[in-house]
Amino acid sequence: MSDNNRSRHITEGVARAPNRAMYYALGYTEADFQNPMIGVANGHSTITPCNSGLQRLADAAIEAIRVSRANPQVFGTPTISDGMSMGTEGMKYSLVSREVIADCIETAAQGQWMDGVVVIGGCDKNMPGGMMALARMNVPGIYVYGGTIKPGHYKGKDLTIVSVFEAVGEYTMGRMDETDFKAIEQCAIPGSGSYGGMYTANTMSSAFEAMGMSLPYSSTMANEDQEKVASAAESARVLVEAVRRQLRPRDIITLASIENAVAVIMATGGSTNAVLHFLAIAHAAEVPWNIDDFERIRKRVPVICDLKPSGRYVATDLHRAGGIPQVMKILLNAGLLHGDCITITGKTVAETLANVPDAPPPGQDVIMPIERALYPQGHLAILKGNLSPEGCVAKITGLKNPVITGPARVFDSEDDAMAAIMDRRIRDGDVVVIRYEGPKGGPGMREMLAPTSALVGQGLGETVGLITDGRFSGGTWGMVVGHVAPEEFVGGPIALIREGDSVTIDAHQLLLLLLNISDEEMAARRKAWAQPKPRYVRGVLAKFGKLACTASRGAVTDAFEE
């Protein structure tokens, strides 16, 4: 099979003379048409520091493609800054952007018959959006993560974006003066790169490396370091070779490799968003994977990395300690990874890890050996019960009070809940319920970092529960339960909760989310329930609300056959 087996559809033959004329206008020569056309999906943007450092990575990839005797074709992808839109209506566009990014890449690459695609992204939804596109198309592809941000510093402490969100709560409680508050705001983000803890972008990049769709060590590099540029160039070279070997995403994205990715997510204490996104990626790759599979992996994989938000360290610390290859080698030796999975380099996981030390380096406590795991089981639990029969997601490690029963404080939007928190109307033992924020009801399934961080800042992170049909940021921690499904908008049980009802979150053994009322009362409330009108009837939010499926299936917009 020729290297240009796709692009020749628009470059070969007499009938394609007009097509070739367009390429000549771009500087192509006749000889170039024999070489593969490689798309570079460039997420560079000055909207957010997560993406502001991507252009030099794209430039390195473009040059490497040319040196490899292939033709780079550059196109842009949009991004939304989760950190900047957090707590506003703009956050409704965040999950929507995952679908838009996937659609943009698919549209450009398929419309132009590209032979392979290098995806370069930074902010949270860039990650799954790009991978979903590669899995859908099954055209040779590789993911180049833009890299993590370095930590900020103030008064001898490392800072991340979450430090600022939590400072809001401390400041409103009078526990922090204005000088410290402003200093944290100004020092938390020192440059370009994605949020520094094991938040969503770093979680997904680590998982992509574990799955074999990104190069070893690339997921924990800092954006501003030169090794990130070198890695982008090497990624492009590897992708051109994959095109020549016809190594495709679905050769790599398999049930076994997704299990590897989720094992690494559990071992590193990754984001709850990974549940939603891997359901979507598996759907795109046509891999049989459902929400209960996360619980299967969680029960056998310990947490061995002490990383923010619930731990002490950031991604650059993990990189210095050996990165994801070190984590994977520990898991492989413990029989917790599939070593025979193929990776984008053509090597298997076991071959890739052959020269990685069996144990983490001495003198660090970022990565722990299995026998000294921080927690014996993973942290992302799937809870079920009469409030979430399809399942919901909770981070359960590190909780002092993993079981709480308390009165429901019910809010039909994040904004109303945030106002109550800032007015200090939430008390110890309350269970905050934020609904009408699901994929369809929001629409867009906003992240709730602002209210959860405000609760933590007010000292209520361990004593107040919070449940929502929306999402949480990768920076969230505490007694929080998200992705409650079915959502309020379609008549899920969360729609039937009333102010003051007794609600139980059991994140310890039973893994239940319960509304403590009788079956008869539940049935009566359901009979009286009426579906609310959509908040939007035009535009992309209306489109997403109409097409998105339930969170328990990834909230994708193309699940037409299911």
Curated annotation (Swiss-Prot):
Entry-linked NCBIfam families: ilvD, PRK00911.1
Keywords of the record: 2Fe-2S, Amino-acid biosynthesis, Branched-chain amino acid biosynthesis, Iron, Iron-sulfur, Lyase, Magnesium, Metal-binding
Residues the record lists as binding Mg(2+): 82, 124-125, 447
EC code: 4.2.1.9
Active-site residues per Swiss-Prot or TrEMBL entry: 473 (proton acceptor)
Signal peptide range in chain numbering: none
Pathway named in the protein's UniProt entry: Amino-acid biosynthesis; L-isoleucine biosynthesis; L-isoleucine from 2-oxobutanoate: step 3/4; Amino-acid biosynthesis; L-valine biosynthesis; L-valine from pyruvate: step 3/4
Binding site for [2Fe-2S] cluster: 50, 123
Entry protein name: Dihydroxy-acid dehydratase 2
Reaction catalyzed: (2R)-2,3-dihydroxy-3-methylbutanoate = 3-methyl-2-oxobutanoate + H2O; (2R,3R)-2,3-dihydroxy-3-methylpentanoate = (S)-3-methyl-2-oxopentanoate + H2O
Modified residues (N6-carboxylysine): 125
A molecular function (GO) term: 2 iron, 2 sulfur cluster binding
Role according to the record: Functions in the biosynthesis of branched-chain amino acids. Catalyzes the dehydration of (2R,3R)-2,3-dihydroxy-3-methylpentanoate (2,3-dihydroxy-3-methylvalerate) into 2-oxo-3-methylpentanoate (2-oxo-3-methylvalerate) and of (2R)-2,3-dihydroxy-3-methylbutanoate (2,3-dihydroxyisovalerate) into 2-oxo-3-methylbutanoate (2-oxoisovalerate), the penultimate precursor to L-isoleucine and L-valine, respectively.
Pfam families (alphabetical): ILV_EDD_C, ILVD_EDD_N
GO biological-process terms attached to the record: isoleucine biosynthetic process; L-valine biosynthetic process
Subunit note: Homodimer.
Comment on bound cofactor: Binds 1 [2Fe-2S] cluster per subunit. This cluster acts as a Lewis acid cofactor.
